[in-house]
C-alpha cells in the first residue's frame, strides 16, 4: 500500500509522546535508562504496485484509458527509510517502560504519485512473569488508492473523464496484552480500530474497522513459532451526502483471517547470527452491500493469501540486514449481478527486497554506560 502525505503528520502524536514521558515513572538517577536512535532503509521491487487486476493491467498497457491511471509503470522500485527515537527505563524486577516515536515513508523511482509518509507512537509496559501491555497509534495522512469513477463529478466540458484521484487518511489505534504461560508458551490478545476518511467525491467510502486478534506462540532461544487468528468488521458510511439514497457503493465487509509465522537461527559465531523466517497469511472478506446498483460489491467475497520468506544476518550486536520475498494474491468472487466485463478485483503481487536497520544509543547514565547489557 502506498500514500502521499502533504500535511503535517498528526502533531497529536508528538503531544501524546510528551505526555507519556511525563506519566511514566522515572526514578531519579536510575541507571537503567537510555535513549536510542533507530535507522532503517528498505529497497524493494514490486511487480504490481497498486494491486491492479488483470483487466486493469491490460487497460493500462494498451493505453486505451489513460484517464484511469496516474502511474508511469505498474511495477517499480521503492525506497523506504525509517527513523525512530526510543526512551527505555529498566526499573528492575521485570519492570520496563518503553516509549517510541517512529517516522517512515516509501518513495518510488518512477511513480512518485504513490509516495507516502507515516508516523507512529508506541507505549509498552513490561512486568515480571513475562507480562507485557502495549498501546500504539499510527497516522497516515494521505494514502493514494487509485483513480476511481466519480458518478457525481460534473466535467467542465462534454467528453472529459469522470475518473478522479481517490485517496484517504488513515488513523489506527491498538492495544495488546501478552502473557507468558508455563514452559515456552506465550499468548497475546489484541484489539485495533482503523478510521479512514476519503477526499471529497468519495465520502461514501469513509469507514471504521474493528479488529480482534488472538495469538499463541512457542519461543525458544534459537527458534520461535506463532499462530494468529483475527476477525475484522469494517463499517462504511455508504452515503456521499448528495441527498440521493441508494446510489452509492458500500465497501463495508466482515470476515476472519489469521496466519502462522516461524523463525529459526541457522548459525552463530561470536556476534554473528544467521536466521531465516517464513510467514503465511490468509483472510476472507464478505462484503455487506445489499444495494441493487452496487453490483461490484453486492454478494462479493474476497479470499486473500500471502506468503513471505526472509534470510536475516547480524554481524554486529545492534545492526542487521534481511533479504526477503513476498507473494500476495486476492481472489475476488463477484455476485451473479455483476457484469462479465466488470473489473474482477483480483490481483497478484510479488515483492522482493533488502532491508537494513541499526540502533545507536544516544544517551544513558554514566554508571550504566560503563556496564554491559544484552540487547
Region spans (language model):
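Outer-membrane beta-barrel translocator domains and adjoining extracellular loop/strand segments
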Residues: 49-56, 100-101, 109-118, 138, ...
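Detector for outer-membrane/organellar transmembrane beta-barrel domains
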Residues: 177-196, 207-291
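Repeated loop/turn-to-beta-strand initiation elements of outer-membrane beta-barrel proteins
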Residues: 92-98, 128-135, 181-189, 220-227, ...
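Residues on the lipid-exposed face of transmembrane beta-strands in outer-membrane beta-barrel proteins
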Residues: 37-43, 79-89, 103, 121-127, ...
Amino acid at each position: 500500500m502506498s500514500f502521499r502525505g502533504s500535511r503535517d503528520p498528526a502533531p497529536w502524536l508528538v503531544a501524546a509522546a510528551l505526555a507519556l514521558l511525563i506519566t511514566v515513572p522515572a526514578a531519579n538517577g536510575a541507571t537503567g535508562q537510555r535513549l536510542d536512535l533507530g535507522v532503517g532503509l528498505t529497497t524493494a521491487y514490486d511487480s504490481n504496485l497498486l494491486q491492479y487486476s488483470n483487466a486493469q493491467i491490460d487497460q493500462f498497457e494498451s493505453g486505451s484509458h489513460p484517464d484511469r491511471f496516474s502511474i508511469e509503470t505498474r511495477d517499480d522500485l521503492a525506497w523506504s527509510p525509517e527513523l525512530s527515537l526510543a526512551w527505555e527505563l529498566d526499573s528492575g524486577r521485570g519492570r520496563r517502560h518503553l516509549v517510541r516515536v517512529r517516522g517512515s515513508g516509501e518513495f518510488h523511482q518512477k511513480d512518485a504519485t504513490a509516495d507516502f509518509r507515516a508516523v507512529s507512537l508506541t507505549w509498552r509496559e513490561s512486568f515480571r512473569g513475562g507480562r507485557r501491555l502495549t498501546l500504539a497509534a499510527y497516522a497516515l495522512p494521505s494514502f493514494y488508492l487509485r483513480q476511481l469513477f466519480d458518478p457525481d463529478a460534473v466535467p467542465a466540458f462534454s467528453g472529459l473523464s469522470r475518473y478522479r484521484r481517490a485517496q484517504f487518511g488513515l488513523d489506527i489505534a491498538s492495544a495488546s496484552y501478552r502473557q507468558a504461560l508455563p514452559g515456552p508458551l506465550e499468548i497475546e490478545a489484541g484489539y485495533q480500530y482503523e478510521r479512514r476518511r476519503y477526499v471529497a467525491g468519495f465520502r461514501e467510502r469513509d469507514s471504521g474497522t474493528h479488529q480482534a486478534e488472538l495469538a499463541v506462540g512457542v519461543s525458544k532461544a534459537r527458534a520461535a513459532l506463532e499462530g494468529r487468528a483475527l476477525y475484522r468488521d469494517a463499517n462504511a458510511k455508504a452515503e456521499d451526502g448528495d441527498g440521493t439514497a441508494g446510489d452509492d457503493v458500500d465497501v463495508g465487509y466482515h470476515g476472519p483471517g489469521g496466519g502462522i509465522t516461524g523463525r529459526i537461527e541457522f548459525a552463530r559465531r561470536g556476534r554473528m547470527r544467521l536466521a531465516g523466517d517464513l510467514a503465511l497469511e490468509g483472510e476472507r472478506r464478505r462484503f455487506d452491500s445489499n444495494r441493487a446498483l452496487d453490483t461490484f460489491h453486492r454478494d462479493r467475497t474476497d479470499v486473500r493469501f500471502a506468503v513471505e520468506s526472509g534470510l536475516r544476518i547480524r554481524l554486529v550486536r545492534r545492526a542487521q540486514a534481511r533479504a526477503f520475498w513476498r507473494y500476495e494474491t486476492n481472489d475476488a468472487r463477484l455476485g451473479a449481478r455483476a457484469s462479465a466485463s466488470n473489473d474482477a478485483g483480483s490481483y497478484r503481487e510479488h515483492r522482493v527486497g533488502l532491508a537494513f536497520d541499526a540502533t545507536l544509543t544516544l544517551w544513558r547514565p554514566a554508571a550504566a554506560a560503563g556496564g554491559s547489557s544484552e540487547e
